[in-house]
UniProtKB/Swiss-Prot annotation:
Origin: domain of life: Bacteria
Source organism (scientific name): Klebsiella pneumoniae
Protein name: Diacetyl reductase [(S)-acetoin forming]
Coiled-coil region list: none
Subunit structure: Homotetramer.
Residues annotated for substrate binding in this entry: S139
InterPro entries, alphabetized: 23BDH, NAD(P)-bd_dom_sf, Sc_DH/Rdtase_CS, SDR_fam
Enzyme kind, highest EC tier: oxidoreductase
Reaction catalysed by this enzyme: (S)-acetoin + NAD(+) = diacetyl + NADH + H(+)
BP-aspect Gene Ontology terms: acetoin catabolic process
Entry EC no(s): 1.1.1.304
Function noted in UniProt: Catalyzes the reversible reduction of (S)-acetoin to 2,3-butanediol in the presence of NADH.
Amino acid sequence: MKKVALVTGAGQGIGKAIALRLVKDGFAVAIADYNDATAKAVASEINQAGGRAMAVKVDVSDRDQVFAAVEQARKTLGGFDVIVNNAGVAPSTPIESITPEIVDKVYNINVKGVIWGIQAAVEAFKKEGHGGKIINACSQAGHVGNPELAVYSSSKFAVRGLTQTAARDLAPLGITVNGYCPGIVKTPMWAEIDRQVSEAAGKPLGYGTAEFAKRITLGRLSEPEDVAACVSYLASPDSDYMTGQSLLIDGGMVFN
């Protein structure tokens, strides 16, 4: 029987790459996304290629929706083994521009979404009578504060703390909790960050990317597949003796 994973924010970008990689690794995958159309498109692509996937619409900031999505995946795909709490938003937020609305939106998705995902996964693992793997999207910005990204960066510091605490709390249940910390990845989300940062600096598109890219030791932007390969490891038995860690997969932007 195939193992089952649910990936949030899997309708595009890093989430889609993770879903495709997990299918390649032998998982049946629930494509969970706020955008129902993109989720269905990714699930269809997987199914047509001979894999097994289902689409589920979810707003990760809504606890009930997250629990319902995980339960739907468990029942439809026949089990539950891994959750990847990947969904997130990253608006440019110079300190003086931060509003209560921006803080609420980012924290509701990036932080609460991870908490609800952790809780829903634990419930599903208990119903299945075994442990499992919880994998959270952090960021290099969750290790080192990034300019112009105060709210996003602080939300990812929070995710790293949640990952460590959950790892300690859930170890007795046979559940590991780890994170992955991308750098600059060629995705629609990064294109929007570049637009906002470039615009705020009064520079042409690409300025933001160029400024951040100066810090990449390997000298290139990340492909979504680079991140998916890291998550593949965290979802596999090879990482069974790892918990509470947030792995940097950023091309050498941050060294710890």
